[in-house]
A protein has these predicted regions:
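Envelope-exposed proteins and targeting segments
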Residues: 53-55, 62-66, 70-72, 79, ...
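Periplasmic peptidoglycan-binding/anchoring modules of Gram-negative envelope and division proteins
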Residues: 45-54, 68, 79-110, 114, ...
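Short, charged, surface-exposed interaction patches
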Residues: 56, 62-75, 106, 110-121, ...
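Periplasmic OmpA-like peptidoglycan-binding domain that tethers envelope proteins to the cell wall
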Residues: 80-81, 85, 111-188
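Post-signal-peptide N-terminal segment of Sec-exported extracytoplasmic proteins
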Residues: 25-30, 35-69
Length: 188
């Protein structure tokens, strides 16, 4: 019995050391993730400085994720769904920050205002759901074309159902017509 006590104590000490080492690794990984998100936030703000100053783009650092919000007019022609030349330039400024992501996913979210889709487009987009989905998907395609791994990309459509401003004013509707690019942990 006396032999078992020292062996048990050695085992407990080893297990405690392993647990502490695993905790330390997790803390290092979390700190690296925070540093990565901070660096990405700073880079996005620098790359998009003109667009941020003109109130067309907003970069937010939220808990465990980053969000780049772009009003539609910077990406798409009036009433359009295909990324225009200026939109391609803006996405080229965003793409370098999205390369080489490890353990992250990129959600491209499309939103509209509550104005019904114009009659001329209703055969293609019966509702704002389809319009917001097409816009988000086109942004995903452009990011992929710029080298972003397709396995990290996803498109989401919200239509008119998540406004951030009142749809009663032109300025509110402008803010509601937007694309969000969200960078978050894969397991979220």
């Amino acid at each position: 019995m006396k032999v078992h006590v020292p062996v048990t104590l050695v085992m407990i000490t080893l297990l405690a050391g392993c647990a502490a080492q695993q905790q330390s690794r997790r803390e290092v990984q979390q700190n690296q993730q925070v540093l990565y998100m901070n660096e990405t936030y700073e880079t996005l703000n620098q790359n998009l400085e003109a667009e941020v100053k003109s109130d067309q783009v907003e970069v937010k650092q939220l808990k465990n994720r980053l969000q780049v919000t772009m009003v539609n007019e910077i990406l798409f022609p009036e009433g359009g769904w295909e990324v225009g030349p200026h939109g391609i330039e803006v996405l080229m400024k965003v793409a370098p920050s999205l390369e080489n992501l490890s353990g992250k996913r990129i959600l491209v979210q499309g939103f509209t205002d509550n104005v019904p889709v114009d009659e001329t487009l209703r055969t293609r987009f019966p509702t704002n759901w389809e319009l917001s989905a097409s816009r988000a998907t086109n942004v995903v395609r452009h990011l992929q074309a710029q080298g972003i791994a397709p396995s990290t990309l996803a498109a989401e459509a919200f239509g008119e159902y998540h406004p951030i401003a009142s749809n009663q004013t032109p300025e509110g509707r402008r803010k509601n017509r937007r694309i969000n690019i969200v960078i978050e942990d894969e397991e979220m």
